[in-house]
């Protein structure tokens, strides 16, 4: 007999996991529903493209991925460690730009400011994944993509990316 792995919580408008096995470390068990990682998924309902007006209407639902308290702590710790390092890296690049290139052509300075911003955001994503892998568990993205219910929704036309006009 097969049991349901998720249940709909109409009050919070989300699908909560009933499975207790952690998807991220494959060893732990989840104790509280709030330890789960809730992934927003989207389905485009209507798209309007007129010459001067664009509009997208979509549905959104959060699906819970079972996660133990240890994996939740690792994911939160990775985020807390990554952002200051990425910020320091971006500020270092900006200091380098201001010190060395501000006297030169303004286009070069603007391009290097964008490079610093990209390095900050990209560095944050890279470091978060690095710290998570170093702890020996799946990243949030890999855990979400490996969930069977998420896969079912993706095959039915839902997406992990929010639609934009």
Give the ranges of each region predicted by the language model.
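A composition-biased, non-transmembrane "mature-region" signal
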Residues: 1-86, 123-165
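Hydrophobic H-region at the start of alpha-helical membrane spans
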Residues: 84-90, 111-116
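Hydrophobic, membrane-inserted alpha-helices
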Residues: 89-97
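Hydrophobic alpha-helical transmembrane segments
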Residues: 97-117
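Hydrophobic alpha-helical bundles in membrane proteins
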Residues: 106-109, 121-127
């Amino acid at each position: 007999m097969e049991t349901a792995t998720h249940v709909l919580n109409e009050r919070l408008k989300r699908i909560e996991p009933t499975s207790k096995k952690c998807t991220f470390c494959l060893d732990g068990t989840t104790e509280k529903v709030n330890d789960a990682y809730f992934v927003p998924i989207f389905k485009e309902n209507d798209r309007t493209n007129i010459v001067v007006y664009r509009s997208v209407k979509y549905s959104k639902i959060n699906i819970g991925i079972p996660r133990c308290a240890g994996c939740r702590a690792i994911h939160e710790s990775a985020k807390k460690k990554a952002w200051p390092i990425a910020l320091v890296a971006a500020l270092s690049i900006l200091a380098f730009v201001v010190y060395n290139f501000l006297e030169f052509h303004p286009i070069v300075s603007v391009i290097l400011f964008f490079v610093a911003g990209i390095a900050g955001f990209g560095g944050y994503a890279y470091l978060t994944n690095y710290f998570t892998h170093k702890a020996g568990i799946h990243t949030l993205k890999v855990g979400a993509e490996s969930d069977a219910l998420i896969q079912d929704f993706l095959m039915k036309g839902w997406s992990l990316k929010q639609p934009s006009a």
